[in-house]
């Protein structure tokens, strides 16, 4: 919302996605814009996810098919769908399922993925006492959400990490930059 205010806590996790750098300036996080759209196909037109080189089609329970997604690393925080982005998605539809180009487009949207120079998240403690970070998951935020939240909980509660969690933290440490 653009609101600026002070927030206090004993321990704080910075998990602001693509906007994380606005809170902690030395984080090497930058936004990568992704545009998507949905189409309405005939009933049961596709029953599984279709993957192509630059596009995927995902059937949803409500009958819509999600078409994703562009990867625009120079877009910064420029909002809105663009003709170029929509065209790229349509080309992807054409390559995967040409007849779907005739199906009505229902929704268009965009978002900003938090990315790091090595495309890996930053997870764990920072140099600031009691400040933790969990950001930069790029296109894998949903995939890494469970293990990230488990690790962050254990760190904050000062619980013992297992070998996988310890390896995960080392690999994605803030200190690698």
Segment roles from a protein language model:
Residues 1-2:
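A conserved short coil-to-beta-strand element within the FAD-binding core of flavoproteins
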Residues 5-51, 80-83, 99:
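Central helical "cap/lid" subdomain
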Residues 17, 70, 136:
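Short, well-ordered beta-to-alpha junction loops that form the rim of enzyme active sites
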Residues 20-21, 44, 74-75, 140-141:
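Short, acidic Gly/Pro/Ser/Thr-rich loop/turn segments
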Residues 99-177:
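C-terminal catalytic lobe of FAD-dependent flavoproteins
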């Amino acid at each position: 919302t653009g609101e600026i205010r002070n927030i206090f806590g004993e321990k704080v996790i910075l998990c602001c996605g693509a906007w994380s750098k606005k809170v902690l300036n030395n984080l090497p996080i930058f936004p990568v814009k992704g545009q998507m759209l949905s189409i309405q196909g005939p009933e049961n037109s596709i029953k599984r996810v279709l993957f192509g080189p630059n596009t995927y089609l995902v059937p949803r329970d409500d009958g819509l098919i999600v078409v994703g997604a562009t990867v625009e690393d120079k877009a910064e925080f420029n909002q809105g769908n663009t003709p170029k982005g929509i065209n790229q998605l349509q080309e992807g539809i054409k390559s995967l399922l040409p007849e779907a180009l005739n199906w009505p487009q229902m929704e268009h949207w965009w978002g900003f993925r938090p990315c790091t120079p090595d495309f890996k998240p930053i997870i764990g403690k920072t140099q600031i006492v009691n400040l933790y970070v969990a950001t930069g998951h790029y296109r894998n935020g949903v995939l890494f959400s469970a293990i990230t939240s488990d690790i962050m909980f254990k760190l904050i509660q000062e619980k013992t990490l297992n070998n996988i969690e310890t390896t995960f933290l080392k690999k994605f440490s803030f200190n690698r930059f």
